[in-house]
């Protein structure tokens, strides 16, 4: 399922100051949409022929931040329940963050944005980024990786020298083009799909 989530209509600076108490309002709309979507997938799993215990999230850039958010903020719904879809778990079973942003607060110790409090219950995570990403620098993934490792969460990270930002699924001559196969292999190693 593809989620097109709501974003705040406020003026937004993509070079966001992610430090706590930065004076910027935090919107819960994207996270609410992610929580609701996972609930709907689980509610309709039999009807849609999907395994309710193999539901994951994948996001690019700001969507990568949403991946981290739903992976760490799933204990309670941020909205009033609508129906039975909101009674089950909205914790993803795995997470893939591709050049995620807004995870590192910019310090020298790679402190994680406090809006993504990693715990042992955070799902297994795959991170991917290019070192020459000028939008969301590699420190975003590194900070999240360190927090996941400290919490004992299974995590795999791949850094590429070239690829920039927003390489997505485009075929290029760069090694980063092969990242979907790495994710597929990883999904097999964590039991989400049959191992190759």
Report each predicted region and the residues it spans.
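Alpha/beta-hydrolase-fold catalytic nucleophile elbow
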Residues: 4, 58, 96-99, 128, ...
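Acidic beta-to-alpha connecting loop that harbors the catalytic carboxylate
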Residues: 101, 131-134, 162-164
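Conserved alpha/beta-hydrolase "acid-adjacent" motif
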Residues: 134-140
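Loop/turn elements at helix/coil->beta-strand transitions in domains of secreted/extracellular proteins
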Residues: 1, 52-54, 91-94, 122-125, ...
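Serine-hydrolase catalytic machinery in alpha/beta-hydrolase-like enzymes
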Residues: 1-50, 164, 169-175
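Primarily recognizes the serine-hydrolase "nucleophile elbow" in alpha/beta-hydrolase
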Residues: 29-120
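Short beta-strand/loop motif that positions the catalytic acidic residue
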Residues: 121, 127-129, 133
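C-terminal catalytic histidine-bearing segment of alpha/beta-hydrolase fold enzymes
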Residues: 142-196
